[in-house]
């Protein structure tokens, strides 16, 4: 019997949820995805200091003001890591724009264009890049503009079906619903000791999005993310993409128990699902009605924003040191 890892690959594209290029090459996955938290972790490792130093030197040479230089450096760090990761996966890498722009459509568009252009300028294939955009209304509007300009987007921090429907309407390439964070909220909110996999609210959320998309032949891809357990991963066998931490990937490789496909287009087509007519006001109302989605979206933005600020502080100190050496 083949491993659960190999069995899952029959129905789903497996994605490495890490920003560490050295780790990625050991995982045997198709794609990779990063976020500010993962990039911060990698940037703090001694073995990647040369990559960080190169990005800082490059940013300084662009002759911008202090704010612009910091922006240049942060995006160059992402691109450096992304290009290194792509040496070890055959598919795509997802790079994320600054979470502090989450409610500014124009700023997100401009930053994503800059990131995409820098990626190409440094030798990257644009077809192998997904720009991660937060699943706010403003973010989804930005993704719509970017997709129309040929920049593929991964709309992330998806916690409610309405976000996924809005992203589909915007014709985005891919959405990332967060299984584990939904599960965490329900545990914390209701004091439950846990949910069976059949009743797992995070698994159910992704399954609902999958069913809606496949029922109505929506081409936007679904990449389930933020898994807490191997059982959650297996419960979504058949989802388009599964982005999985290195720890859980290793667990899947070691287990040879049979895996059953849980999601399929054929089964989704049989479901009685009504299409949702969506507008900005409907989007905002339905998000407001969902305390979990509202809170987890806000929390996700805060976490990514906070990690970006920590990374900025580290980069600012490096810039100061380099400037002092050159003085």
From Swiss-Prot:
- BP GO annotations: carbohydrate metabolic process; pentose-phosphate shunt
Q: Which UniProt keywords apply?
A: Cytoplasm, Pentose shunt, Schiff base, Transferase
Source superkingdom: Bacteria
Catalytic residues in the record: 132 (schiff-base intermediate with substrate)
Q: What class of enzyme is it?
A: transferase
CDD domains linked: Transaldolase_TalAB
Q: Where in the cell is it found?
A: Cytoplasm
Cited SUPFAM superfamilies: Aldolase (SSF51569)
**What InterPro entries does the record tag this protein with?**
Aldolase_TIM, TAL/FSA, Transaldolase_1, Transaldolase_AS
Q: What is this protein called?
A: Transaldolase
Q: Organism, per UniProt?
A: Chlamydia trachomatis serovar D (strain ATCC VR-885 / DSM 19411 / UW-3/Cx)
